[in-house]
Regions:
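N-terminal Rossmann-like NAD(P)+-binding subdomain of aldehyde/semialdehyde dehydrogenases
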Residues: 1-103
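Short, well-ordered beta-strand elements within core beta-sheets of diverse protein domains
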Residues: 18-24, 114, 222-223, 253-256, ...
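Structural signal for hydrophobic packing residues in well-ordered secondary-structure cores
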Residues: 20, 24, 39-42, 46, ...
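Rossmann-like NAD(P) dinucleotide-binding subdomain of oxidoreductase/dehydrogenase enzymes
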Residues: 92-231
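ALDH superfamily catalytic-core signature
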Residues: 162, 195-287, 325
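Conserved C-terminal structural/oligomerization subdomain of aldehyde/semialdehyde dehydrogenase
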Residues: 273, 282-371
Length: 371
């Protein structure tokens, strides 16, 4: 890596560090204006973004449009529309005295680093950026070196919208990421593999920086004997094959009764061969919960069932970052729910208010009544 790049990284980091006092005092209106610039830039470069992603990973146009473009715009708008509510101090009362009160205040963490993956290279980098900006931070961004066309257009989007003291982007290979990780960031947000996540966490530990790690894992799917096998097959096929199978929460392995597994396999094959999705008892509960629990904790777990006792049993006796009932993958898009893993599948969560809180320091303030 050229010395000039190292110098630029250190220069921009220090430039953003000097901005923290002003950012801490930023109003909802100022943050919304910044997010509006971001949204306008994404819209202005929409077709270029789509073309770049298609060059990098060969995604179909409609998949890029829906997941990468609309997903990013939705994330930005959600932050814009809820800023006042999220930023407002929250009264929680006091356990010490009826004359006292407690409030929660949300402060920006400071200078944040966002490292994106290659499978959804634009949205999974820009959605966290929107949350960081909503929380009042500055950010330095780096996309995956496997998606250089997308990185190039992302740089254009960011530089058209922001001064580098607000948001900066660096391009390049692993040496650039390594140099970035040497800087004393206040928070690091990483999406990628568990192995690289460990490297990121090790680097963060040197500066006691907080982290959000959006990792992966093998997501189990349980199909109850009473559930419509055709419906399950359609949803599983979509969830597994969308994005050429490269989705961190795609269903990975199934639990189904042996006497219906061949029938289900035939239905699933028919659905897949059709191009998109066309068509008695479940395994012993203790067996599939044991198998799930013997593995690393997954990022997602799925249950197809109308039996509430079965659903409750699975949810109570397994651990996963998230879970969905009678569907797969779609929970990622629900901003009312936190999205994140647990242990090897991740640390921390985001989306909606949860992303705002992830990029904020939640400060408790005790207030004693004056005499």
């Amino acid at each position: 890596m050229e010395q000039q790049v190292k110098d630029d990284i250190q220069r921009v980091f220090q430039l953003q560090k000097k901005q923290q006092k002003a950012l801490r005092a930023s109003t909802a209106e100022q943050r919304r204006e910044k997010l509006q610039r971001f949204l306008d830039s994404v819209i202005a470069h929409e077709e270029e973004i789509i073309e770049a992603i298609r060059k990098d990973v060969r995604k179909p146009y409609h998949e890029v449009k829906k997941a990468e473009i609309e997903g990013t715009k939705k994330a930005i708008r959600d932050n814009m529309n809820n800023l006042e509510q999220w930023m407002a101090p929250k009264e929680v009362g006091s356990s010490l005295s009826p004359d006292a009160n407690g409030i929660l205040m949300y402060e920006p963490k400071g200078v944040t680093l966002i490292l994106g993956p290659w499978n959804y290279p634009f949205m999974l980098t820009m959605a966290p950026l929107a949350a960081s900006l909503a929380a009042g931070n500055s950010a330095i961004v780096k996309l995956s070196d496997f998606t250089m066309n997308t990185s190039n257009i992302a740089a254009k989007v960011i530089r058209d919208a922001f001064d580098e003291k607000e948001v900066a982007i660096f391009e390049g290979e692993v040496e650039v990421a390594t140099e970035l990780l040497d800087q004393p960031f206040d928070h690091i947000f990483f999406t990628g593999s568990t192995n690289v996540g460990k490297i990121v966490m090790t680097a963060a530990a040197k500066h006691l920086a907080s982290v959000t790690l959006e990792l992966g894992g093998k997501s189990p799917t349980i199909i109850d004997s009473e559930y419509d096998l055709m419906d399950a097959a359609k949803k599983i096929a979509v969830g597994k094959f969308v994005n050429a199978g490269q989705t961190c929460i795609a269903p990975d392995y199934l639990f189904i009764k042996k006497d219906v597994q061949d029938k289900f396999a035939g239905i699933l094959q028919t659905v897949v061969n059709a191009g998109f999705m066309e068509d008695d008892h479940t395994p012993d509960r203790s067996k599939f919960t044991q198998i799930v629990n013997d593995r690393d904790k997954p990022l997602a777990l799925y249950v197809f069932s109308k039996n509430q006792d079965l659903i409750d049993n699975v949810l109570q006796h397994t651990t996963s970052g998230n879970a969905a009932i009678n569907d797969v993958v779609v929970h990622f898009s629900d901003v009312n729910l936190p999205f994140g893993g647990v242990n090897t599948s991740g640390i921390g969560s985001y989306h909606g208010v949860y992303g705002f809180k992830e990029f904020s320091h939640e400060k408790g303030v005790f207030i004693q009544a004056s005499k």
